[in-house]
Structure formats: structure tokens, C-alpha cells
Amino acid sequence: MTSLYDFSVLNQDSQETSLDAYRGKVLLVVNTATGCGLTPQYQGLQELYDRYQEQGFEILDFPCNQFMGQAPGSAEEINSFCSLHYQTTFPRFAKIKVNGKEADPLYVWLKDQKSGPLGKRIEWNFAKFLIGRDGQVFERFSSKTDPQQIEEAIQKLL
């Protein structure tokens, strides 16, 4: 695979969706959880989305239950939680695994492009990959990086 656009993932209805639909946009790919101490980052993510979506920015939300089971529940329950507590409107996909033998191919590729605090492994919920309009990883941000701290990098790519 040569770019993010070469991948397909499952949407929340378990239908295969090509990421080529996001060609030409600046993307932030995030593994998320609804029961984590970092869950309030959803607010900052939504603020970035509101500010830059019209300029070609999208956030791709991938719930992940690999870190202490902090993303329990069905897709519907996760959507309800995010809508009720954080009014999120960015695209959310089916739950995936980001580490180990069952890691989604998208995340295998992302981790191969940029290492993080633990090398290639995703360290926790809310690790972020910023993707340029060319479908390539521009930067990787740790779970602890507040969404507002990456705003300048987003602006550069827009």
C-alpha cells in the first residue's frame, strides 16, 4: 500500500468503505475510547472539525477496545455517548484493533510510516496520525497531545 487512499475499512454498519472517498483532504486518524481519562479530547477534536472541515479537513474516528476495555458497547452506544456528551459530527468507523496480530491493516501501515513513544506500537487511546492531502502520514502525535496542540500542523497542510 502506498497511501491511506489504498485502504478500505468497515463503517459502523460493518460495510466496507474505501478511504479513497477522502482523497485530497487533510485527515486526522484517531483511535478513540468512551471510558478513558482522555475521552474529553473528543471536545477538542470536535472544535478542530468545526473550525476546519469547510477547508477540507476530516477526522476519522476508530473506536478501539484494546486498552483496558475502555471502548465498550455497540456502535450505536458509542455514537449515542459521543453525540450526547461531545456533540461529535465527524465520521466514526467500526471498532478496530491497532496493535498485535489482529491489528487492522490501516494501522499496521500508519505505524510503519511514523513511530511514536513506544516505537511502532500505539501507546494508548487517542493516538493521532495527521495525513496530508497526498494520503501520506505527515506527523504522529501521542495520546497525551491535546487536539489544540496540533492545530498549527493542520493549518500548514490546509
Residue ranges and their predicted role:
Residues 1-158:
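Chalcogenol-based redox active-site neighborhoods
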